[in-house]
Amino acid sequence: MKQTILIFLISFLFSSYSYAFEGQVILITDGDTITVVNNGKPEKIRLYGIDTPESKQAFGNQAKNFTYSMVYHKSINVEPVTTDRYGLTVGIVNVNEKCLNSELIDKGFAWVYDRYCKKDMCDKWRLLEKEARQSKAGLWSQDNPVAPWMYRRNRNK
């Protein structure tokens, strides 16, 4: 019985573990959502731990354009973290030894999404956000930027 439980636990751990993969970016939906060709199939990826302005928000297009300039038609590495409620892979995206997630924060095009950002790197990202705020980079040049989750909440009322 103990052996059966042990085998089950080991197989469960390995089945839920997601491996990093390489792919080419074919579409930029917005600043924090891209589509990558993975094993010949398109896969939508949501960037882990961050939230960029919505398309109709101030700096929404700039965030999308920044993401486009960093990854469009480039080979990237995706480190899956989880799957969201819509079935999208949520992950960390690296291109040319740079992390897209952290670059968006550093340039002032994204908030750290504290509700979901729980990995160790999130502490570093919070410091990057603080520095971007202090230097008034990107969206932080506005007097009162509205976080995307607040924008969505208010829009849906």
Q: Language-model features: where?
A:
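Small beta-barrel nucleic-acid-binding modules, primarily SNase/OB-fold domains
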Residues: K2-K157
